[in-house]
């Protein structure tokens, strides 16, 4: 999962929690915690899995409406997704709904 330097890294053995990431976070402050695949590509271009800067570019070009901040990052490896489905997923969905978000972009690792 993608997180900001200073935040607690994701548990690479499986983590159903999430991290809030402000859209204006500098690229050099983003980190990746994952051991189930080669993260070199993510280190080179974090937008390949968390398209926050690309979304801001689309917003600036007028192709999408206002981008929501913060964005939410989840771990890609969750062997038991029950807590994600029953607790953290609905929690984030509720926050997005409260903020009036019309659509989401989901990236995978």
Residue spans of the language-model regions?
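An N-terminal assembly and electron-transfer interface module characteristic of large anaerobic redox
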Residues: 1-109
């Amino acid at each position: 999962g993608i997180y900001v330097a200073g935040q607690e890294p994701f548990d690479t053995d499986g983590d159903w929690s999430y991290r809030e990431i402000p859209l204006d976070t500098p690229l050099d402050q983003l980190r990746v915690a994952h051991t189930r695949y080669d993260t070199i590509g993510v280190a080179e271009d974090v937008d390949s899995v968390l398209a926050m800067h690309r979304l801001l570019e689309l917003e600036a070009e007028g192709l999408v409406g206002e981008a929501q901040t913060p964005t939410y990052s989840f771990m890609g490896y969750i062997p038991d997704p029950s807590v994600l489905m029953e607790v953290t997923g609905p929690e984030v969905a509720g926050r997005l709904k409260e903020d009036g978000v019309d659509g989401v972009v989901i990236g995978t690792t």
